[in-house]
């Protein structure tokens, strides 16, 4: 079983299309509006072989930092903790809005980029626990 968060986004759509054409595994897609309910009630973690975590509120004009932080940071942490508990590999994507084409000091362009950078730092800080997570 493969879980894809953010399957309506560009990268998620392409992952989904590829997997539908090339994989025989069951695919579960998770969307923003039901993400918290899904993670709370999903009980088949032991059957999951891979999590493709592309889901985030990616609206670069969103100014509600609490909303962004809840979905882009806290939800991601919950998902990663499930991955650790069940030893599920995770593929996670950062964002060009965090790094752009710059060298040196990171200067996120918007609140969305700030939350993505927070997750990048979180993963770096917990790499020994998150040995199955690749960004």
Please identify what each model-predicted range represents.
Residues 38-71, 82, 98-102:
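NAD(P)H-binding glycine-rich loop region in Rossmannoid oxidoreductase-like domains
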């Amino acid at each position: 079983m493969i879980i894809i968060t953010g399957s309506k986004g560009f990268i998620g759509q392409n992952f989904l299309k590829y997997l539908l054409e090339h994989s025989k595994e069951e695919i579960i897609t998770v969307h923003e509006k039901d993400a918290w309910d899904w993670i709370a009630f999903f009980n088949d973690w032991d059957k999951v072989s891979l999590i493709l975590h592309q889901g985030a509120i990616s609206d670069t004009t969103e100014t509600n930092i609490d909303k962004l932080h809840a979905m882009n940071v806290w939800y991601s942490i919950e998902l990663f903790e499930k991955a650790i508990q069940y030893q599920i590999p995770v593929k996670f994507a950062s964002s060009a809005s965090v790094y752009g084409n710059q060298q040196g000091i990171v200067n996120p362009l918007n609140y969305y980029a700030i939350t993505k950078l927070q997750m990048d730092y979180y993963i770096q800080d917990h790499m020994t626990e998150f040995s199955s997570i690749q960004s």
